[in-house]
């Protein structure tokens, strides 16, 4: 299984990339994690936000592998426990295929992507910086896999 993290935004600070990579390198081969940055549409183009999100959404859809599970990260989504995430990932691993996690930009994601998602998941009810969500998601994926594998990283 591969976890594909599609994140709208680029030119993140180095500590964001370093934090994400720290957890990505810890992942076992059977649960690889990969970050794909989606360049945001120019906000000074005179287009409406809906048009910008639709253009970003079209670029994301063009990159998504066919038959992958789609999980949208959104503060209004369901809040799972770590054990709940581990349980879901365990089921997804049995089903096979890859799982794509989508992180929107400053204006969010195209509503069509949210509507097409298999899951809409919130890391927190708080609004989080989008770069930080990359790190938190990578850490939670690593923690869930550690829990599945019986690794002592997760001690709660």
From Swiss-Prot:
Task: Give Gene Ontology CC terms.
Answer: cytoplasm
Q: What class of enzyme is it?
A: transferase
**What Gene Ontology molecular function terms does this protein carry?**
rRNA (pseudouridine-N3-)-methyltransferase activity
Recorded superkingdom: Bacteria
> One Pfam family of this protein, by short name?
SPOUT_MTase
Location(s), subcellular: Cytoplasm
Q: What does this protein do?
A: Specifically methylates the pseudouridine at position 1915 (m3Psi1915) in 23S rRNA.
NCBIfam families noted in UniProt: PRK00103.1-4, tRNA_RlmH_YbeA
Tell me which family the UniProt entry assigns to this protein.
Belongs to the RNA methyltransferase RlmH family.
Q: What is this protein called?
A: Ribosomal RNA large subunit methyltransferase H
